[in-house]
Amino acid sequence: MTINHLNIVVADMQRTLDFYVCLLGMRQTFDVMLQGEWIEEVTGCKNAQAHCVFVMPDGGGCRIEILQYINPEGTALMPNALPHTQGLRHFALEVTDLDSWYQKLSAAGVSFVSPPVTVPFRIVEGVQKRLCYCHDPDGVIVELCEHLRS
């Protein structure tokens, strides 16, 4: 078994693509309008219609499916929810030069929970992990992490 994709429902597709494609450098791989009986059946929403875009990190890995529901209109997450809020809380993007990413995204107005921190123990032998959490435009927590090999 593998993870095929994760899904984020958003309020504004362009604002979200500006974050994931323009700021984070992901590439857009698919763009379609979802509508018809099949989407109504799978979502349980009468007259469901959604704009669907897939993005993917240049380094490969899991795709992100971004949906903006046209009908019914999506409901918002609690703004800037903290990492201890129950439910699916974050996904992680491994980067090189975490400090540069933090500076770049901070300068672009991205909201961070904290600056990068170092995990005080090794999850994998010989690898030190540094990370920070930021919020995407819809409040989804995105972990940026780097693994420093010793």
Briefly describe each language-model feature range:
Residues 9-61, 125-127:
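Core segments of cupin and vicinal oxygen chelate
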Residues 36-41, 73-78, 119-125:
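A short, acidic/glycine-rich surface segment
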Residues 66, 81-84:
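Helix-adjacent hinge/juxtasegments
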Residues 36, 71, 148-150:
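A short acidic/small-residue loop/turn micro-motif
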Residues 61, 72-73:
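Active-site/binding-pocket entry motifs
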Residues 8, 64, 92-150:
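Vicinal oxygen chelate
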Residues 1-5, 50, 86-88, 129:
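Short, solvent-exposed beta-strand edge segments and adjacent coil->beta transition regions
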